[in-house]
Amino acid sequence: VIIGTHPHTVQPVEWLTGKGGNKTLCVYSLGNLISSQLYMKLVIEDILTFDIVKSAEGGKITIENVEAHPVVCHFETDETGPVDGLDFALRHSIRLYRLEDYTEELCAVHGAHLAYGTYKKKSEAFTVASLWDYFRAAAGAEFVKK
């Protein structure tokens, strides 16, 4: 299994096939997990689960039951509240939610809407459906069970 990191965004999960026909699970990036960064693609994360199985005969090791579990790093801001030195609204109430449990009500108060003080980013829909669409496109739908 290869687990990459750093780009702050969910990246594809795929099987790579070696010269000898062996399969390796490759996860290019799981995202940030916990952050208060400002855009949808930076607050949707991947918790990947899988089983490492060693056969009784021959000791062959395989990776099975791979599942991608999207989570949202939720935070809130106060529209008229304090800002930091870069004029970003201060964030609070940071929590992780499984995307399957995330609601439109939570989307409506997510701090990404108010991240630049009074400026509201309108170019990116921040809805449960758009979070699912982004996650499936970024990670690949193969391992998303819902």
Residue ranges, per PLM feature:
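A short C-terminal boundary segment appended to hydrolase-like catalytic domains
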Residues: 43, 47-146
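Conserved beta-sheet core of the metallophosphoesterase superfamily
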Residues: 1-48
